[in-house]
């Protein structure tokens, strides 16, 4: 079955261009031209990925992203912005977008991003043949449990609501427990490209993870900042 992509943009020429190129690459494409229509189609069509413009009528892309995440709809979101402004990019990522691109862009570049995001989601997604009691490869760090084969993570026995990118980052940290990982390394390993050196993307996602597993985000005991270097995930110490 072909993967389904929801393309949301109020510029008809961009929608037509993206739809044509994505369909040529073998995807089923549905479209929306405003934020309200995007929310409705996301809820009813359950796409595998959304290509979402920031500047939209009725509801902008930032609000659409926010509402989708509030409804626990965790499919990947690739945001498009005509503004080369850090505010748009960082805010979108803070609200749960997985990736962004700045206009103008080439259709080939969009196809490459879509393919990479879907491939990572597919690799991380649980197999339909997986039994519930299969826990091979689980990573346990204090009260945190990561189940790579099930694409799930738990903290104090409660399942965490994570976006695909948050899970991939947590999993990479967990697989390298106790190691200091630079922001550049995390960009390369989790995002597969360097975002032109924009390491704030890592910081935003680390902040999201801390919100979900740290009792005090100002004094984290799991995900530690190593000043001037990066981050590491470690076992909490008894006196912390």
Curated annotation (Swiss-Prot):
Residues 4-118 form the Response regulatory domain. Phosphorylated by PhoR. The modification 4-aspartylphosphate is found at residue 53. The keyword Phosphoprotein applies. Its main location: cytoplasm. SUPFAM superfamilies: C-terminal effector domain of the bipartite response regulators, CheY-like. GO terms for cellular component: cytosol; protein-DNA complex. It is found in: Cytoplasm. Pfam families: Response_reg, Trans_reg_C. Keywords: Activator, Cytoplasm, DNA-binding, Phosphate transport, Phosphoprotein, Transcription, Transcription regulation, Transport, Two-component regulatory system. One of its GO terms (molecular function) is transcription cis-regulatory region binding. GO terms for biological process: phosphate ion transport; regulation of DNA-templated transcription. Residues 136-235 bind DNA. PANTHER family: ALKALINE PHOSPHATASE SYNTHESIS TRANSCRIPTIONAL REGULATORY PROTEIN PHOP, REGULATOR OF RPOS. Member of the two-component regulatory system PhoP/PhoR involved in the regulation of alkaline phosphatase genes phoA and phoB and of phosphodiesterase. This is Alkaline phosphatase synthesis transcriptional regulatory protein PhoP. It comes from Bacillus subtilis (strain 168).
